[in-house]
Every structure is written in C-alpha cells, then in structure tokens.
Curated annotation (Swiss-Prot):
Domain of life: Bacteria
Organism, as annotated: Bordetella petrii (strain ATCC BAA-461 / DSM 12804 / CCUG 43448)
Gene: gcvT
Subunit description: The glycine cleavage system is composed of four proteins: P, T, L and H.
Family, per entry: Belongs to the GcvT family.
Protein name stated in the entry: Aminomethyltransferase
One BP annotation, GO: glycine decarboxylation via glycine cleavage system
Pfam families, sorted: GCV_T, GCV_T_C
Amino acid sequence: MSASLKRTPLADAHVAAGARMVDFGGWDMPLAYGSQLEEHHAVRRDAGMFDVSHMLNVDVTGPDATAFLRRLVANDVARLTVPGKALYSCMLNPQGGIIDDLIVYFFAADQWRVVVNAATADKDVAWMQRVAAAGSYDVAIAPRRDLAMVAVQGPNARARVWAARPAWQAATEPLTPFVAAQVADDTLVARTGYTGEDGFEIVLPADQVVALWNDLLAQGVRPCGLGARDTLRLEAGMNLYGQDMDELTQPDQAGLTWTVSLKDPERRFVGRDALEQFAAPRGFVGLKLQERGVMRAHMAVYTPLGEGEITSGTMSPTLGVSVAFARVPQGVQPGQTVEVDIRGKRVPALVCKLPFVRHGKAVEHS
C-alpha cells in the first residue's frame, strides 16, 4: 500500500479477510476477497456488504439550507417534505457539466445531508462553499469524516441487518426505497444502494463500524469488493462518475435527464441556462453483445447515424453475455443493432433500454 492512500476504518478488516487492495480515487479499497463472481452472485441471490466509508457525508444546515440546495443541484429538493426522504441528483457547473452525482437527504427545512463520491469529495465541498458564498446563503457546510458507511445489499440483506441489530428493525422495516431512519445518535439506515437489489446503506460513527461489520459477517453476509460492485451497478444501469460522466458531460448525454427538474421557472440552479440553450448531440444507451467477447470502455461503436463510444463495459455474471453503456448519436433506438470494435473486429450488439437486470432477474430486450 502507498503511504499516501487514505484508509477507511475497515481497512485492517479487509486485509485480515484476504482482500486484494487497490487504489480507488486515492483510497486503499478492496477489489475482491477471493472470487469476484461469487461476490456478485451473493448479492443477486442472498446478501453481500460493501465498505463505502470512502464516500463523504456532508451536513448542510441553516436558515437558507433549502434555498441553497435548490440552487446547487439540478433536481428540486423542494419535492422532499417527509423527514428521511432522499433524491438522486447531479451537481452541475455553469456549462451544465456534471461536477458529481449525489444523494440528498431531507430532515428539516434547515437540516439536510448530501452524500458525495470519494474521488470528488474535496472538489465537491469546495464547490458547495463557493456557491454558498456567491449567493450569500446563510448555511453551514460540514463534511463528516467522523462517520463510516456500509452498504448491505441483496434479497436477504434487510433480514440479515435485523438479525445483527434487532433494535433497528422497528424503525427500518417500514422504510420504502429512498427513505432513511435515524436509529441511534449519528446512525442512519437508508433503503438505498448501488446494485439494483434491495438493502440498506448504513451510516454510523466510525468507531462503531468494525463491530457492525463483524456482526454482519457472523450472520453470513458476504464481504464484496469494488469488482463486484462494478458488475452489479452495470447490470443495474447505474452510472459511475468519472467513467460514464464528468464535467464535460451534460445529464442528457449520460442518461440522467430524469434527475433534472425544470418545472419551476423561477429556480435558476447552476447549469440551468446551459441546459436550456444546448441540445445534446449524443444519447446514452445500453448495449448487449450478440456474439462472444467483452465490451470495454473507450471501444468504438458504429451506428447508422455515426460513431459512438462505450463508457463502461463488462461480462455480465447474471446474463452470461457482455453488457455496456455507450454514448451514441441522438436517434439510435432500443432494438436496433450496432457494431462494436473489439480488437479490430466489428461485433454486433443490441441497443437496449437500461437496466439489464432488475431485482436479480434479466430484463427482456428485443
């Protein structure tokens, strides 16, 4: 391990479990603990858990917190009125490019939380502070590096969490997707995830996370690394920041139009002017390879309307074929066949709506 890499509170537990550690956005993180394939299937069929403590929880509080977040993110947080409810959004630059994708939690009009990606965390906090200062918003922006985070995912994930922490069941069993409950001081359980499966993401004080991890292990929850996390999120049609979108990519070029709210003409969020003036020349689609081979990022895609490029690709453990996301010319439609350049050979691929897998089952594409 490089001395410059950051470590989560679970780093020693990963090494003790035999994890292969890699640099992920400046963090020393587990790639896999053995078989990446078995970890993937554990989440689809039973329950797996991921250390996501490298992601940053940021508390946004103060009298102007709601107005500030309505300016900061492209989705409209005013939709959130039930404490614990969350939404997914992008934070844009003035050109409409994506600074980061994130989840926003509402607790009260003056009390919110934003969860941002690890590799962009410092940049995100600096941008939030800049937007707050520019608009003279009366808000406090507090990064919470004292917290850790574990995602427990799979059809049996919730039951395993309740077995490990019975006291949490009453507050968390009624939760619907994208809703969180506070179960103890600084302990939040949200029915969210990045796999396409049911489960919880649990935020808790860093000094309590090793005990939770060990108790979940004792309940048979399988530790999973970044490798399985990537194949799971790809099957589920979920973007990865820095891979499928970045500051040069607008939401509609990354299949994220649904995360942008233009309903309130008075809400001038950062990047709105650019989005209203610019029609994206490229769309975002799923691809399913029709022959043997594996699609990977940056491979060329040939369509009747011009050339595109794969942003993420893998072999799908659930489907047994290669799947990918691609940025292609607008007008390329699901059901059409395109060609992918794999080592100089053009291989046919079916254009698909996302996701490829929903709740462990293949989504039919034709």
